[in-house]
From Swiss-Prot:
Catalyzes the conversion of dihydroorotate to orotate with fumarate as the electron acceptor. The lineage of its organism: Bacteria, Bacillati, Bacillota, Bacilli, Lactobacillales. It holds the Pfam family DHO_dh. GO terms for molecular function: dihydroorotate dehydrogenase (fumarate) activity. It is found in: Cytoplasm. Homodimer. It comes from Streptococcus equi subsp. equi (strain 4047). This is Putative dihydroorotate dehydrogenase A (fumarate). The keyword ATP-binding does not apply. Substrate binds at K45, N69, S70, M71, G72, L73, N128, N194, S195. FMN binds at K45, T46, N128, K165, V193, G220, G248, G249, G270, T271. Its main location: cytoplasm.
Length: 311
């Protein structure tokens, strides 16, 4: 029997597919729909210290090859999502979950994480170091010194399982520099990648979204090659205890297969989930299982990270 089960840290999941933060996870109702689907888990909307309305609309648009968005982290506040996942973990039949959070400053991030540390929540936290769509707030993970300082502070008190959501990197030197920092800390996972920041999509003679004069994060088909490169680069460089989550351009079982082949232990779906809804998890799981069966693979470990190079 072909299995798409996987593990992150000590947490077992019956399927490697899940949503990406920001997509189909704003409300409790949306999260419950993911929970009831074929997905192995869900990640919440990135929760900030206080609720946020986000950027003015229109702030999302589908395109022929994916999507562009400048949402600006709209959310109900981290406490809303913390309450949901803490309550759900009381049910032994519940899946394990990921709580996505970030502050608008390093101080706010620490306030949030200290509250989670003191809470009853025992699941995974995904620290979002990579949102490209908050005006005036740079993507922290591109500042290696600031990232190192923040992680050093966090792990001086935070003892629960925590991973990081990364922006795409484009230079081999940056893969090396980032990995050297991440390997110093007991991270549970690294999620590669968030949307490619500050793309521009034009319809006739006008931009298609309002914030930032049309600049926004690019997702979908556009970013799969970049996502695969980041997944494989960090799979090669990070400690084996730091699992990789692959995100970007996944709309078929073949796409998920390629992420796993590059080293991903789990695969998140964003743009295609937004377009198709939670039923997508059943379809992509079946497509992935069919590929595995055709190739004679019984588990993800049979091919995870086994990308072949030209001789």
């Amino acid at each position: 029997m072909v299995s798409t089960a996987t593990k992150i840290a000590t947490f077992a999941f019956n399927n490697c597919l899940m949503n990406a933060a920001g997509v189909y996870c704003m409300t409790k109702e949306e999260l419950l729909a993911i929970e009831a689907s074929e997905a192995g888990s869900f990640v919440t909307k990135t929760g900030t210290l206080a609720p946020r309305q986000g950027n003015p609309e229109p702030r999302y648009a589908d395109t022929a090859l994916g999507s562009i968005n400048s949402m600006g982290l709209p959310n109900h506040g981290y406490q809303y999502y913390l309450d949901i996942v803490t309550e759900m973990q009381k049910d032994q039949a519940s899946k394990h979950h990921f709580l996505s959070v970030v502050g608008m400053s390093a101080e706010e991030t620490e306030t949030i994480l200290k509250a989670i540390q003191a809470s009853d929540y025992q699941g995974l936290v995904e620290l979002n170091l990579s949102c490209p769509n908050v005006p005036g707030k740079p993507q922290l993970a591109y500042d290696f010194e600031a990232t190192d300082q923040l992680l050093k502070k966090i792990f001086s008190y935070y003892t629960k399982p925590l991973g990081i959501k990364l922006p795409p990197y484009f230079d081999i030197v940056h893969f090396d520099q980032a990995a050297a920092i991440f390997n110093q800390y007991p991270l549970a996972f690294a999620n590669c990648v968030n949307s490619i920041g500050n793309g521009l999509v034009i319809d006739d003679e006008q931009v298609v979204i309002k914030p930032k004069n049309g600049f926004g994060g690019i997702g979908g088909d556009y970013i799969k090659p970049t996502a695969l490169a980041n997944v494989h680069a960090f799979y090669q460089r990070l400690n084996s205890s730091i699992q990789i989550i692959g995100t970007g351009g996944v709309k078929t079982g073949r796409d998920a297969f390629e992420h796993i082949l590059c080293g991903a232990a789990m695969v998140q779906i964003g743009t295609a989930l937004h377009q198709e809804g939670p039923a997508i998890f059943k379809r992509i799981t079946k497509e992935l299982q069919d590929i595995m069966a055709e190739k004679g693979y019984q588990t993800l470990d049979d091919f995870r990270g086994q990308l072949q190079y030209k001789p």
